[in-house]
Amino acid sequence: MHHDLVDVLIIEDESELARLHAELVQKHPRLRLAGMAASLAQARQLLHATPPQLVLLDNYLPDGKGVTLMT
């Protein structure tokens, strides 16, 4: 059985936490890191350019609450 990779976008403004999430994603055999964003503005650009299948979303970002991306 063939399984496609799941594209993951990490939205996190704390660089050390973002790096840790990225390492975990890259180590998982079924996940692929699609991108990383440290703000809502960056996240919106990435979401439109390459929509991921999974998002790891920080709710407290420098330019607003992450949950607003879901509306």
Short names for language-model regions:
Residues 16:
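Conserved Rossmann-like nucleotide-cofactor binding loop
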Residues 36-54:
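Acidic, metal-coordinating helix/loop segments flanking the phosphotransfer/catalytic sites
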Residues 58-59:
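Active-site residues of response regulator receiver
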Residues 39, 65-68:
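Acidic catalytic/metal-coordinating carboxylates
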Residues 62:
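The feature encodes the CheY-like receiver
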Residues 1-7:
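Non-catalytic signal-transmission and effector/linker regions of two-component phosphorelay proteins
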Residues 12:
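Conserved acidic carboxylate
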Residues 19-23:
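Charged docking surfaces used in two-component/phosphorelay signaling
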